[in-house]
Structure formats: C-alpha cells, structure tokens
C-alpha cells in the first residue's frame, strides 16, 4: 500500500486561504480523478429514537437539558423502521441511515437494532446507523448483522470541542471510530460549520478526519440549524462562501471519500448547493426531515438534479433489484408538472 502523507495544520490553513475560484478549480480536479462528477449518492435518515438524550451538545434539540418543544419518543418498532426503509427505497434512496438519541445503546436494544440492519440489507439498501458511543462487542454485533456504515461525528476541532460538548470527550469519539473500523464497518464522520468556531477550527476538524489511520469513507459537512431553546440558537449565520470553502477543502484532503451535504440544506438556495457540488460534494440526505430539523423535500431535490444535470448514484443491490433506480431516473426525465412533483412519493 502506498504511503499516505499526513496533513499539517499549516497546509490546511493554506488551502482555506486560497482564492475561492482557485480552490474550487483544484477541488473539482481532485473530484474528477476519483468520481463521476454527475453522480450523487442519495441517502435517507430516520430518527428511530427521538429526544431525551443525556448529552449536552449545545446545538442539539434532542438533548434533555434544553427546552425545545421536542417530544421524546421511545425506540421505534422494527417493522415501523422497515416500512420507512421501503418508502425511502421507493423514493430513490440507496442508503438508509438510522439515528438514535443516545449516549450509547443499551444491551437490551441490541437485538432490535440487529433486526433493523438485517431487514434494511434484505431490501438491497446500504445500512447506516448512528447510536452514540459503541463498545467493541456492540460494534462487532452490528458488523455481523451486516451494517455497512456507522456515523459518529467529531463535530469540530479538538481545541474548540469543549465549548460545545462536555458530556463526552473528543478521545471517546476517536475511540468509537477505531472500534467501528476494527469491526469491519465503514466510517462516516464529519462536523458542523457555524458553532462559533474559527477558520482554524474548521481546518483542525478536517485535519483530524484526514489524518485518521484510514480516512472516513463518508464525510458529512453540516451547516448549523439554529433551534430555539438550544444554547446556539442565536449564533451568527454561516456565510455561504465559507461553507462552500469547507466543502472544497474536505474534497481535496479526502479525495476518495464521499463528501455529504447534510443538515442545513433547507437554508441554502439552489445556487449555494450547486457551488457545493462544484466544490466536490457528491452525497445528500434525501427527504423532508433530518432527525428533527427540516430538509428539502424530495421533489425539490429532483428538480435541482435536473437543472444541474446530476444523477442519483446506483448502489450494489440484489440481482435484478433496480426498481428504485428506474423510478428516480424516470422522475428526473419528467417535466415540471403535478405528476412530476408526486413522483418521489410513489
């Protein structure tokens, strides 16, 4: 295996300081070396257990410490989750992600989580989960059930992290990523722009991710969604160009990773999203809600895909099982009519 050089903070800072158009040009060149620039991975995220989380993440409406009006819900029944997965597949998603508001999963819930993974995989979808901290045995059980990806974000730089979260250390997050990797599960890990961090902190986050023994296969870059009742509700808005710049630097530093536009897309206009794709983003969450915050509706995404000439990426599925791909491709070729806008909900 070829030696992979480690990034330094000064190198990453230099990327952030490049003229934006030069940075975008470099990022697009890197992107085209490893990916089809017209292909975008489409994923769906479902909250399988909502609210009442004991953590104190200052951005999160699911924390039990903040009064956001969010109603806590118990872990969903397995069949409810699988029905949502069927709908996601019919709408064109190729990966189904399941998120639970926990510090860590309880052992009593593991059999249900395993059944969810097995059921999603049986549909020909990729399965992803985000459940908090994992033990080695839990990671291995999920791997044995067939889990493809595990999401556990670093959120920000090690230096700024303590300003946002105190109930889980940065090292705990790194340890969970290591356990997931050792179990043979692919890693999904990224962060949030807009927490009040500096450009140096954004560089520090990407430095941590890119310098992992193996960089994450998937890197979600979130724009802070400000929720009333959370400590960050009054944070300044993120400048669109600053966000696009972060996407571009992530693409250059992790050339073979999927860079995902995650939370905050509802706040972005089409032009901003288009520039994110130009900067190297090639994955989105598809659907009307990301856990507990809004996300663009499916029909808006299909419309944007058509305008930009983008296509949903196919995934390896069971032989002959390409129904969701055909459905989405048909929707992409349909004019802007009432029928088109209903296509994603079929």
From Swiss-Prot:
Pfam families of this UniProt entry?
A: BATS, Radical_SAM
* Protein name stated in the entry: Biotin synthase
User: HAMAP family in the record, alphabetically?
Assistant: BioB
Keyword Coiled coil, does the record have it? no
CDD domains noted in UniProt: Radical_SAM
Q: Which gene encodes it?
A: bioB
Task: List its EC numbers.
Answer: 2.8.1.6
Q: What's the subunit arrangement here?
A: Homodimer.
């Amino acid at each position: 295996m070829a030696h992979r050089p480690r990034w330094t903070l000064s190198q990453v800072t230099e990327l952030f300081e490049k003229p934006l158009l030069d940075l975008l040009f470099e990022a697009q060149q890197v992107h085209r070396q490893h990916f089809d620039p017209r292909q975008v991975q489409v994923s769906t995220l479902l909250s399988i257990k909502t609210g009442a989380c004991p953590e104190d993440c200052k951005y999160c409406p699911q924390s039990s410490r903040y009064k956001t009006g969010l109603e806590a819900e118990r872990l969903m029944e397995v069949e409810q989750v699988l029905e949502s997965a069927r709908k996601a597949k019919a709408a064109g998603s190729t990966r189904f992600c399941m998120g639970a508001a926990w510090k860590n999963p309880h052992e009593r819930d593991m059999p249900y989580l395993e059944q969810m993974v097995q059921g999603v995989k049986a549909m020909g979808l990729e399965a992803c989960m985000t459940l908090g901290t994992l033990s080695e045995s839990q990671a291995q059980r999920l791997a044995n059930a067939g889990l493809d990806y595990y999401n556990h974000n670093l959120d920000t730089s090690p230096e700024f992290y303590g300003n946002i979260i105190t109930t889980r250390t940065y090292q705990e997050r790194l340890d969970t990523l290591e356990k997931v990797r050792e179990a043979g599960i692919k890693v999904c890990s990224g962060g949030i722009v807009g927490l009040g961090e500096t450009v140096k902190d954004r560089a520090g986050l990407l430095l941590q991710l890119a310098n992992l023994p193996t960089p994450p296969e998937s890197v979600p870059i979130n724009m802070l969604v400000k929720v009333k009742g959370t400590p960050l509700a009054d944070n300044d808005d993120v400048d669109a160009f600053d966000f696009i710049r972060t996407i571009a630097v992530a693409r250059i530093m992790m050339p073979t990773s999927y860079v995902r536009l995650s939370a905050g897309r509802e706040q972005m206009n089409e032009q901003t999203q288009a520039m994110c794709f130009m900067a190297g983003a090639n994955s989105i969450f598809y659907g009307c809600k990301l856990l507990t915050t809004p996300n663009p509706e499916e029909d808006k995404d299909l419309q944007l895909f058509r305008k930009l000439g983008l296509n949903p990426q196919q995934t390896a599925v069971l032989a002959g099982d390409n129904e969701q791909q055909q459905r989405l491709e048909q929707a992409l070729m349909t004019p802007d009519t009432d029928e088109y806008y209903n296509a994603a909900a079929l």
